[in-house]
């Protein structure tokens, strides 16, 4: 209301595709208690499909691959004009970009040990510095084959380099988990007579090149478009 300088009584809220009736009703009730009189719930994969251009003029079935910071889910969405049916859902709600960060932290500490830096007793401040560097390196490696980080630790300064290949090799088991769940949803869709045409990438962690590359390898007959601002795909689709 501060942004629009007017009262806001209608709201669109996105919810995970795995939400049941009770969870949806609880969400709607919470919005009503907050003062909203018109509450529309939109499943997140539907919002993502709308953002990718599915706005009433297409009839096909797509997969929405959503790899966020803390969770992963894969959903099959059947699109018939303005009708969106999320009919198959799988996910790992303990898996997300934070796990890739954790593996990068391990890589950094190994490289620090090679420089005779004892990582067993790092202070909380140094641990935070290592995690900051890990997140920064992960982002840099989306566009580069290698990246460097300068760390300012209590035990001294350090400079390390990590290659994309090194990072992808280390995190392959994490990506494998998402691929297995994606295969399961694709098989469920096929069993229902549906043909998957595209895999839409959602969630900031889907920026990592290994995601699109691996999906393209595993599903050669399905188009995997370049991610379109995956961090905001759901919110922009809802808007």
Where are these regions (language model features)?
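Oxyanion-binding/catalytic loops of NTP- or PPi-dependent enzymes
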Residues: 2-239
């Amino acid at each position: 209301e501060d942004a629009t300088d007017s009262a806001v009584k209608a709201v669109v809220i996105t919810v995970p595709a795995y939400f049941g009736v009770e969870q949806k009703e609880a969400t709607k009730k919470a919005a009503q208690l907050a003062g909203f009189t018109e509450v529309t719930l939109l499943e997140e994969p539907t919002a993502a499909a709308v953002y990718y251009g599915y706005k009433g003029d297409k009839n096909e079935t797509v997969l929405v691959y959503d790899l966020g910071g803390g969770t992963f889910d894969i959903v099959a969405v059947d699109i018939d004009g303005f009708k969106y049916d999320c009919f198959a859902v799988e996910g790992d709600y303990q898996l997300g970009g934070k796990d890739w960060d954790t593996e990068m932290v391990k890589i950094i500490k190994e490289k620090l040990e090679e420089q005779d830096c004892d990582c067993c007793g790092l202070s909380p401040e140094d641990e935070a510095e290592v995690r900051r560097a890990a997140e920064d390196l992960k982002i840099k490696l989306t566009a580069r084959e290698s990246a460097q980080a300068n760390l300012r630790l209590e035990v001294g300064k350090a400079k390390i380099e990590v290659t994309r290949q090194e990072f992808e090799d280390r995190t392959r088991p994490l990506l494998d988990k998402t691929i297995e769940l994606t295969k399961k949803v694709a098989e469920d869709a096929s069993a229902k007579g549906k043909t998957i045409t595209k895999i839409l990438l959602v969630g900031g962690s889907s920026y990592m090149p290994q995601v699109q590359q691996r999906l393209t390898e595993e599903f050669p007959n399905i188009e995997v478009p370049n991610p379109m601002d995956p961090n905001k795909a759901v919110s922009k689709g809802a808007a």
